Amino acid sequence: MQQSGQKGTRNTLQHAIGPVLVIAQFFGVLPVAGVWPSCRPERVRFRWISLSLLAALILFVFSIVDCALSSKVVFDHGLKIYTIGSLSFSVICIFCFGVFLLLSRRWPYIIRRTAECEQIFLEPEYDCSYGRGYSSRLRLWGVCMLVAALCEHSTYVGSALYNNHLAIVECKLDANFWQNYFQRERQQLFLIMHFTAWWIPFIEWTTLSMTFVWNFVDIFLILICRGMQMRFQQMHWRIRQHVRQQMPNEFWQRIRCDLLDLSDLLGIYDKELSGLIVLSCAHNMYFVCVQIYHSFQSKGNYADELYFWFCLSYVIIRVLNMMFAASSIPQEAKEISYTLYEIPTEFWCVELRRLNEIFLSDHFALSGKGYFLLTRRLIFAMAATLMVYELVLINQMAGSEVQKSFCEGGVGSSKSIFS
């Protein structure tokens, strides 16, 4: 009954994050076939001829064109903090789309290896609350992060609409509301094309897709890491059930083999996802540094103020979620090693000692291309770096609060998330 309870709810990574990946494909992210929750991992395929890949390539090429046009704006108007925003965003989106395109070719292999390892944790021996709630918990994480991203984008749109209204009223512009709105928000695009209503759906889709992929790098890593954490929690639960019992060598040998399978899967994640990890840490640090710089300047009206602080808070919470999700894996492994020491000395055997040696010798952590490990120590290191940066800004920018004239017009009149 327990076995059917776990398998009946299909608590696998494919089933858990399938709905999120289906949404992601609409925005050109991870274009692979067979990601529906009901599909078996064996049916996951990367296809060169598919609508999802076509959408991904269109958005990737569009990001490159957008980057080139944003570069022209910077060259024409100078390298300023308010002109480089769109360029920075385009460059980051190019890397995001590019990394996910590369990952999509490896995703069928990753999800099949994941499914093979997960069969172990669907057995009755691992039937606990972590296993039974695996899919629902991951989906809850996904929904919460996507809703938070939607709220952040909504505050951006609200701020942009309000500023567009103020520009027309206060600057006495003789312009159509929506035409002025899109020309303010996507100025670089209208360097090469004229505004017509037919462009609005395409502009909105590309804007939403670029915003989505900017968010999804962290969301995807959170889901993968939380899923891996719960598998370690299942193993911890099983060990704790027998911590006061003298178990035979065969029991600890089975645990050790399961741990090695889990460690191999973590090694695959480390190899295949390290590019995403480097990208996430890099663009999040850049964004937070830019926003800290802006916190010393006037943000304008109340809509800009609301968006600025909401966006900054959201990104900090998002990156902390990603960092804590990744660092929870080595932390859970460390907790298991602590539990092993609760076993009385007279109950120790050869296989238990071997199991303990694995926990002592392996770090069980994801890395960024081998340059750094995603542990709690890294979180404090990044926080310390940001604090030093803020102290330098406090010293350099005291009394330098300047607000650009609202009716200056031209480049920089809109509020990019990076400017």
UniProtKB/Swiss-Prot annotation:
This is Gustatory receptor for sugar taste 64c. One of its GO terms (biological process) is signal transduction. It comes from the Eukaryota. The chain crosses the membrane at residues 16-36, 49-69, 83-103, 140-160, 205-225, 306-326, 378-398. Residues 37-48, 104-139, 226-305, 399-419 are extracellular. InterPro entries: Gustatory_rcpt. It is a multi-pass membrane protein. One of its GO terms (molecular function) is ligand-gated monoatomic ion channel activity. Belongs to the insect chemoreceptor superfamily. Gustatory receptor (GR) family. Gr5a subfamily. Expressed in Gr5a-expressing sugar-sensing cells. Residues 1-15, 70-82, 161-204, 327-377 are cytoplasmic. It holds the Pfam family Trehalose_recp. The gene is Gr64c. Keywords: Cell membrane, Membrane, Receptor, Transducer, Transmembrane, Transmembrane helix. One of the few identified sugar gustatory receptors identified so far and which promotes the starvation-induced increase of feeding motivation. It is found in: Cell membrane. GO terms for cellular component: membrane; plasma membrane.
